[in-house]
Amino acid sequence: TPKWGLSVNNKLGWVLMEAPVFLVMLYLWWNSSVRFDAAPFLFFLLFELHYFQRSFLFPFLMKGKSRMPLAIMLMGVVFNVLNGLMQGEWLFYLAPEGLYTDAWLSTPSFWLGIILFFIGMGINLHSDSVIRHLRKPGDTRHYLPQKGMYRYVTSGNYFGELVEWIGFAVLTCSPAAWVFVLWTFANLAPRANSIRNRYR
């Protein structure tokens, strides 16, 4: 952390870093003319469900007293604001008129996507729980988890998040959502590989 300069409490940093995308999406949805159309409204709820958990629940489940570099937090804020704008603008403003009708909710892509979304969310939440319960109080050593999805992949939490966003992209067929999938992969895959190499 010292090489990154100023830092903040990790829990506070997570809230400040993740909450902007929740708020940006809320603002864009509320000011759109399609906010209560069934499909856009459901897209909004799914997106916000993820980020409510990530912004306002996940940070307070963290253990330990680590700190987050201020620079990392600010970079996260910028990315999340831009991502929120990209996702919300497409879903509520730029999508072709008549694309997201009620009939969208009966398409195969919607149902496949929503199944993937909740499978990914379940994997992500369970994997986070496994990590939180790895160490006993006072133990500062690092361990590679062996439960749940960790039996098959090195970073079950990252895998779950990637599956979740693939599901969101499939259920919306949104170009913006697919861009986010690519970014998520580009961000998480190297981190997962680094963890794998560390414990090899």
Predicted features, each with a name:
Residues 23, 50-135:
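Glycine/proline-rich, flexible active-site/cofactor-binding loop segments
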Residues 18, 48, 89, 97, ...:
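Glutamate identity and glutamate-enriched acidic tracts
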Residues 1-75:
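Membrane-helix and juxtamembrane interface regions of eukaryotic multi-pass membrane proteins
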